[in-house]
Curated annotation (Swiss-Prot):
Site (Reactive bond 1 for trypsin) location in chain: R30, H31
Protein name (database record): Double-headed protease inhibitor, submandibular gland
Record-annotated site: Reactive bond 2 for elastase: M81, E82
Cystine pairings recorded for this chain: C16-C50, C28-C47, C36-C68, C72-C101, C79-C98, C87-C119
Residue span, Kazal-like domain: 10-70, 71-121
Source organism of the structure: Panthera uncia (Snow leopard)
Molecular function, one GO term: serine-type endopeptidase inhibitor activity
Amino acid sequence: APPPVGDQAGGRKVDCFKYNTKGSAFACTRHERPVCGTDHRTYSNECMFCMLTQNKGFGVRILQDNECDIECTQYSDMCTMEYLPLCGSDGKNYSNKCLFCNAVMGSRGALFLAKHGQCQSP
């Protein structure tokens, strides 16, 4: 599905000020409404997303309302050679999730999953 109007392909920006009611502290509820950040990490709700990404120093956005298709919370610098290709938003093919997640972390949240499988060749 195409992204909603007003959203960029790289996810939607969140107005985190609405959760930051106590100056520098966030007042988040335990309400489960998962969102997926462009860093490919699932956050339990939008407020937790704001709280946990505020100090990352780069513009992590919400990629989708729901859990991430590809979760990059647990990944290794050393990747196996398994071949389960993923197509990145940069048009490059990544041989597996580990290599894709390393590229996501290297891009500081700018890279996201375009689709499972290989990118279309020109």
